[in-house]
Amino acid sequence: MLFGRRFHVRANYKVRTTIALHLVTPAGTLLDLILRVTKDQIWPDLLYIVRHGESAGNVAREAALEAGEHMIDIDVRDVDVPLSDLGQRQAIALGRWFGALPPEKRPNIILTSPYLRARHTAGLIAETAGMREDAYSLFVDERFREKEFGVLDRLTPLGVKNQYPDQAEFRRILGKFYHRPPGGESWCDVILRLRSATEMLSREYCAQRVLIVCHTVVVLCMRYILEHLTEEKLLAIDKKTEIANCSVTLYEHDATLGPRGNLRLKLFNFVAPLEEAGALVTSEPDVKIGAR
């Protein structure tokens, strides 16, 4: 029988765990199990957040706007919208940039939205960067998917006003942060699912180098969570900045930020890898973005 026996377990990735077991009575009728977990670091070393390359939906939306159309002409589910030729070149250019980084700066964990354009971007980045299959892990995570627009799917802003004037008015009153179209999501809904994903980053990928390939609203909402922004600050960033395709937002762990350190924003909407490679920089919103 164990009395006050203490076990110390040194876990991976700078995590210190102490387990104390105390049997209070010889009969063992009471087991006092104390699990104390302390972490020197609770965040990844590096967190890259990348918007996918230009998609066929981006191109179709731009054409619909120029023609004054109400609907965006695309014949597949938004989940299945592929990259355009330019989008593939953008992803390849970004992959070369990652490949030129020192090994300790390259991602070893890739998390991607299940949407085809994001998965294709993630695959091209890994392939072009020359990442060996045994040097990284890639996971598809639906929490990083595009914001869902419900009945407003594939409508241009003009189409929303024409077909759903009540929703256009609700959005004007509530603002994009809180407005939830029927069958769709508000920005708050996206933030709710991303909070779960952010907890996973801390729990499973502490001290790792993580790349997330996702969508415009996800990039912005991750900033909202990680930097504890307000609605006003987030919407000010959104108003000022169009998130470019294959742009990089980077957070680095800074041990000086609090007792366990924290993530510090180092890059936002960084497009130099595309410019250096001569790939056109684009920022057209996604196909469903008429009421983003």
Model-derived segments and spans:
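Active-site-adjacent alpha-helix immediately C-terminal to a catalytic or transition-state-stabilizing loop
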Residues: 119, 195-260
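Phosphate-coordination/substrate-recognition cap region in phosphate-metabolizing enzymes
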Residues: 4, 27, 32-48, 56-57, ...
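Short, conserved phosphate/pyrophosphate- and ester-handling motifs at nucleotide-, phospho-/glycolipid
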Residues: 52, 87, 215
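Eukaryotic N-terminal low-complexity, Ser/Thr- and Lys/Arg-rich leader segments
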Residues: 1-45, 258, 276-292
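Short, solvent-exposed aromatic-acidic interface loops
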Residues: 265-277
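A solvent-exposed, charged loop/short amphipathic helix patch at secondary-structure junctions
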Residues: 62-78
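Short beta-strand scaffold positions
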Residues: 112-113, 192, 213-214
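Short glycine/proline- and acidic residue-enriched helix-loop micro-motifs
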Residues: 74-82, 168-188
